């Protein structure tokens, strides 16, 4: 087998159509563009959001809402996760949460939520606590400290 023997797969290559080369070719005169009109012109493309001259939908609808750039985005951890990953009497910090793989990054801080049950007394140091999480941690003899 030689490099010159390689041929494209049958049906994969299409013959180029030469337009505007006489009426006998079947694509002469108007070159398949019909008669007159915007789409028959040289730059006759209409952009997809063009609505024929009427006021477009994106200008008819009002603007609303905003992005609060001062909002704090906490990384959340539930007390049931702390129960699974830590032993009785351990100190739980955001760095240790990263270490054991409970969180991927700290963002604006770590918030502990009260989903699930906890039986081990832990010293939990975080940026925020939900009221139920604080109650559950302190009920078993642990501490909830805000950074």
Curated annotation (Swiss-Prot):
InterPro entries: Ribosomal_uL15 (IPR030878), Ribosomal_uL15/eL18 (IPR021131), Ribosomal_uL15/eL18_sf (IPR036227), Ribosomal_uL15_bac-type (IPR005749), Ribosomal_uL15_CS (IPR001196). Gene3D superfamilies: 3.100.10.10. The keyword tRNA-binding does not apply. The keyword RNA-binding applies. GO terms for biological process: translation. GO terms for cellular component: cytosolic large ribosomal subunit. Belongs to the universal ribosomal protein uL15 family. Binds to the 23S rRNA. Part of the 50S ribosomal subunit. NCBIfam families: rplO_bact. This is Large ribosomal subunit protein uL15. It comes from Thermosipho africanus (strain TCF52B). The lineage of its organism: Bacteria, Thermotogati, Thermotogota, Thermotogae, Thermotogales. The gene is rplO.
């Amino acid at each position: 087998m030689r490099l010159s023997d390689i041929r494209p797969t049958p049906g994969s290559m299409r013959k180029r159509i030469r337009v505007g080369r006489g009426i006998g070719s079947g694509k002469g005169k108007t070159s398949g563009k019909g008669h007159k009109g915007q789409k028959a012109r040289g730059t006759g493309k209409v952009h997809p959001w063009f609505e024929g001259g009427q006021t477009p939908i994106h200008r008819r609808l009002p603007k609303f809402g905003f992005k609060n750039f001062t909002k704090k985005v906490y990384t959340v951890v539930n007390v049931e996760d702390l129960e699974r990953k830590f032993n009785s009497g351990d100190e739980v910090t955001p760095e240790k949460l990263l270490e054991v793989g409970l969180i991927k990054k700290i963002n604006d801080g770590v918030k502990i939520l009260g989903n699930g049950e906890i039986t081990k007394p832990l010293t939990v140091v975080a940026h925020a606590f939900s009221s139920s999480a604080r109650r559950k941690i302190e009920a078993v003899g642990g501490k909830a400290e805000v950074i």
